[in-house]
Amino acid sequence: MNTLKMELPDKSYNIYVGSGLLSRVDEYFNLNRKVFILTDSGVPIEYAEKVKDCSKEAVIYTIPQGEDSKSLLVMETVLKAMLNFDMSRKDVLVAVGGGVVGDLGGFLAATYMRGIDFYNVPTTLLSQVDSSIGGKTAVNLGGIKNIVGAFHQPKGVLIDTDTLKTLPKRQIAAGSAEAVKMALTSDKELFELIENCGITENNLEEIIVRALKIKKFVVEKDEKENGLRKILNFGHTLGHGIEAEKLGELYHGECVALGMLYMCAPEVQIRLTSVLKKLGLPVDYQYDIDKALEFVIHDKKCQNGVVEAIFVPCIGQYEIKSLSVEEFKRLVKERTGEI
């Protein structure tokens, strides 16, 4: 087992990574209080039940699987369920699932009674390597991803790698995009490991831990995304636009993969294309580039007509460039061959 510690001025917490951790979750989390367990219909129910079995008093609430559950409507329904469970400010929410459950669960915890504790138990590769740590919580509104939210750090994170054994191959592939993202901007050796060996049962925990160490370092330096943390948006500026344009046809990680391709130097793009293909991620997918770019204008990363885009000039390094919307559109269209 690996234990990392996120060290922040106001709230530090441990991140536990290993096999078989879920069955003894009470060794890592304080569950000696009321525990509201949030999961979704795509997550094997036994994961939530393991948390319940280790809790003093718990209830499991299941939301529908998918991005549509990251909404204010679903949020209101869950808040009412928390209220009906008579939760106090001393009680805790445990999010058991992927990025949707973690994002919604964290935002619920941030807003219920002005803030309660929550623990993250990510069960997808994407959430394990990225979204489960760092404190970003949000829901979608009006077709815009993560536009309503708050920074609310978890009390702890438990990553049981055994949960990945039940994931479909496509979801594993989608999650691997976030590990590639971390490697491209910050860890040349990690990229070469994935490039040469892929992601296998033998190197899975190492890749998760190395990706988490990158994000941990970045968040500790810039918790509220005033500077350095923007590098974690690599692939997401255009990726979010593609995701909105395709309306659930593609997974988030697949859109990030497509979004990364055109933000690299040509020689990096060649190697990245090969890696994405090896991992089972799309490198050539039909989407309406104009519609995708329109969504970019409304993204959080676009402020006052300026898009802050992350580029990778060589593997393990990054550049943050401020471009006008028109400059960004022209660049993307040139690189995708649209003009």
Predicted segment positions?
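Glycine-rich beta-strand-to-loop/alpha-helix junction loops that act as flexible
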Residues: 65-66, 96-98, 234-235
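Active-site segments that bind and position negatively charged phosphate/pyrophosphate groups
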Residues: 193-291
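Short glycine/serine/threonine-rich phosphate/pyrophosphate-binding segments
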Residues: 100-107, 128, 240-241
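C-terminal charged capping/lid subdomain of soluble metabolic enzymes
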Residues: 177-179, 269-339
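Non-catalytic interfacial helical region
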Residues: 79-96, 105-120, 130
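A glycine/threonine-rich phosphate-anchoring loop and its flanking beta-alpha core
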Residues: 14-16, 107-199
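Residue-level signal for inorganic ion chemistry
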Residues: 18, 37, 122, 160, ...
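ATP/NTP phosphate-donor binding region
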Residues: 1-92
